[in-house]
Amino acid sequence: MDRNSQKKHHLLPVFLILLCAVFFIPAHTSAAPRINLEKYKKGDDYLVLAYNTRYGKTTYVRSQPSSKSAKLAKLKHSDALVVDQSRITAGVRTSWIPVYLPSKNVTGYVSTSIMRLKAISYASFRKGASPYAYDAICYGLKYLGTPYQSGGNDLKKGICCSALVTKCFRKAGRSMPETYVINQYNECKFISRRDLKPGDLIFYRSNTLPPYGGLVHVAIYIGNGFILNATGHTGSTYPNGGVCIKALSYGSHLASRAIYGRLL
């Protein structure tokens, strides 16, 4: 073997290592950020939410603050969970957020990698779109975790979107029409997105499913960019579906066709 051949022979392993680095190592690898959750330990006067901010990305609720622990639930884009403030330790930076799963009656942990946190004060519900907003929203929040059922009317066994809205506002003392989305739509005056207040209704349209003039879903706005609804579009059980909280951008194909209404 001549000298040039020997040099090429020695360079081959180096070339292969570099090739692997280029093609097989992810371009963006970073650990989940460690954050101080203390500012979100706000007490019973606030609803603190952790929500998935990434389109097309999922993450898991784990049984322990470790990626090796059991998976309790999958979180899709816009899914929001109530933070278990009792599990927040003051002064400690962590990459795991404690969240409550009412459907399982347990606290789990979700990585900070694609999650964000926001707080909503219960007092803001009293400044909502109507005198009924506070009681309607608080009543609905009691049933987080109830599964979705098309045409369902039971707050414990299974319920649909329009039945949830009707039950919440009737409980708050407002007369409501029969539980059809189109009837609730006809009870509203229409407002812009920037004018939304807690207690307003959001109607979603679809070009592929045309019942009730294209209306396929209704939700209650609870403030700070979130809705309370009973949904089956991305799953029928909590936290993807059923009675759950979503970011307003939920279901981008639906959110782009939303209509905002205020009960008259």
Tell where the protein language model's regions lie, with residue ranges.
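Gram-positive cell-envelope targeting signals
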Residues: M1-P33
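Low-complexity, acidic Ser/Thr/Pro-rich repeat tracts that form intrinsically disordered stalk/linker regions
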Residues: T29-Y51, T58
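Boundary regions of SH3-family modules and the immediately adjacent low-complexity/disordered segments
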Residues: A32-K42, Y100-Y134
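SH3/SH3-like (including bacterial SH3b) beta-barrel domains
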Residues: S63-H77
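SH3/SH3-like beta-barrel superfamily modules
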Residues: K74-S113
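Structural motif
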Residues: D79, G199-D200
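Catalytic Cys-His active-site segments of thiol-dependent hydrolases/isopeptidases
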Residues: M176-Y180, I220-A247
